[in-house]
Regions:
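A structural signal for small-residue-enriched, beta-sheet-centric alpha/beta enzyme cores
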Residues: 2-107, 113-433
Length: 433
């Protein structure tokens, strides 16, 4: 993978690809290391370590697939309240690898804990021994291939030796690049806000381009904050905000075995203690976290495999959110809808089809459909002044908004997706060749 860093650091802004990279800098309590473990045929950074020298509170949400990767199993077995390290590898999903894949993670965790404990003794006034049970993993890549335990294990000393206690934009970007697979762009986002009167940072990176359909998080996403928040508060905040962000996107309707989104709190900013998420002091943080998650999830869609258009689907005035969500994803996951949009064909009949197959009862006399600001269906009827040429012209845009109004209540749901192009087929047909 050849990356032009000049293009990344000084990008030409494109709304579709969302490649305006933000200036993530230092966040207290987070250390980063990146290396090449030679997991790909051609050398590239493919192994990333986040090290929390004083530990970090954390929370995660994982895939709801009935077949999960070995790293998800490992992470679910971790009961430590604080995490000392997160290790992420690209190229290999460690899924459908069985006991051998799990034992590989155990070996890597044991090696990492020994070396990080040694580093603690070298660098800290009050060193602590680090346990393998304080290390979690993210894996992404091909399913079913033997996990490269030895290559990763041999790279751990290099990672530990290269740990950077102070970060800058380049280090964060290299970390985001290191976890990419078929992604074309690294995904980095930041927000700053206040808890009480204390300013805190929220940084996030993610990867994802294909095999994305929500059932919790739909990709790999990692959020870091210097705020002081408990595991319980982090868990509640993450689950609350994931539903309308990472759980609102789809590129191809396929749910991965490896999905995870995690949030880590280093506690370096001594903000007011938050006992529940209804505390007014956490309101700004909650909003900023939602912004980070939504921004990252939209970037995943915009960078979808072969994507040429970013599609927003708003289902409004529904009697409940569940129905709105089901209809939104029935449209978002329709290959006929997605190919029509790729071909810039104003075939609104495919939207009707997708609404109908959702299984939700529809009062046609109340149904309205808009493409952007152009009303197509009003109260179940094609509008009298409908001009297909006007809609066809709208379809040439890179961002397409579809609005479906059920007019049966006040609930709503927004889904985000991409078009389906020949390039998507090429990418996935050639994925392993």
């Amino acid at each position: 993978m050849t990356i032009n860093f000049k293009d990344l650091i000084y990008p030409k802004v494109s709304r579709l690809k969302m490649n305006d990279f933000q200036d993530l800098d230092h966040i207290e309590g987070v250390s980063i290391s990146i290396t090449c473990a030679n997991l790909y045929k051609k050398p590239r950074d493919d192994l990333v370590m986040f090290y929390f020298r004083d530990g970090a509170n954390y929370a995660s949400v994982y895939t709801q697939s009935k077949i999960v990767s070995e790293n998800i199993k490992w992470n679910l077995n971790i009961k430590s309240k604080k995490i000392k390290s997160l290790i992420i590898n690209a190229r290999n999903a460690n899924a459908f690898t069985g006991l051998e894949g799990y034992k590989g993670l155990k070996e890597i965790a044991e090696e990492t804990s020994l070396l990080l404990s040694k580093k603690q003794k070298e660098d800290e006034n009050y060193p602590k021994n680090i346990s393998p049970n304080e290390i979690i993993f993210g894996c992404t890549g091909t399913i079913g291939e033997k996990y490269p335990t030895q290559k990763i294990k041999e790279s751990i000393p290099i990672l530990v030796d290269k740990i950077k206690y102070t970060q800058n934009k380049l280090i964060w970007m290299k970390a985001a690049l290191g976890i990419m697979t078929t992604d074309l762009k690294p995904k980095l986002v930041m927000e700053e806000c206040e808890i009480g009167k204390k300013k805190v940072k929220i940084y996030g990176i993610a990867k994802g381009s294909g095999m994305i359909f929500p059932n919790m998080a739909t990709t790999l996403g990692y959020i870091f904050t210097d705020a002081d928040l408990s595991n319980d508060i982090l868990n509640e905040l993450l689950k609350k905000n994931i539903e309308t962000t990472f759980n609102a996107i789809s590129t191809d309707g396929d749910t991965s075995t490896n999905d995870m989104v995690s949030i880590f709190s280093t506690g370096k900013v001594k903000n007011s203690k938050i006992k529940n998420i209804n505390d007014k002091k956490i309101k700004n943080f909650n909003g900023a976290l939602h912004s980070v998650l939504l921004n990252l999830s939209k970037r995943v869609v915009a960078d979808g495999e072969g994507a040429s258009k970013f599609i927003t689907i708003n289902v409004i005035k529904s009697k409940n959110e569940k129905d709105a969500k089901k209809i939104a994803f029935s449209i978002a996951n329709s290959n006929l809808v997605k190919t029509a949009i790729a071909g810039e064909d104003p075939n609104w009949g495919r939207i009707i089809m997708a609404i109908g197959k959702s299984g939700i009862n529809i009062d046609l006399k109340k149904l309205s459909i808009n493409f952007g600001n152009i009303k197509i269906i009003d109260k179940g009827q094609l509008v009298n002044n409908y001009k297909e040429s006007e809609v066809a012209n709208y379809m040439k845009q890179q961002t397409i908004d579809i609005s479906v109004s059920l007019n049966t209540g006040q609930k709503k749901f927004t889904a985000y997706t991409m078009d389906l192009t020949k390039k998507y087929i090429e990418i996935n047909a050639d994925y392993r060749t």
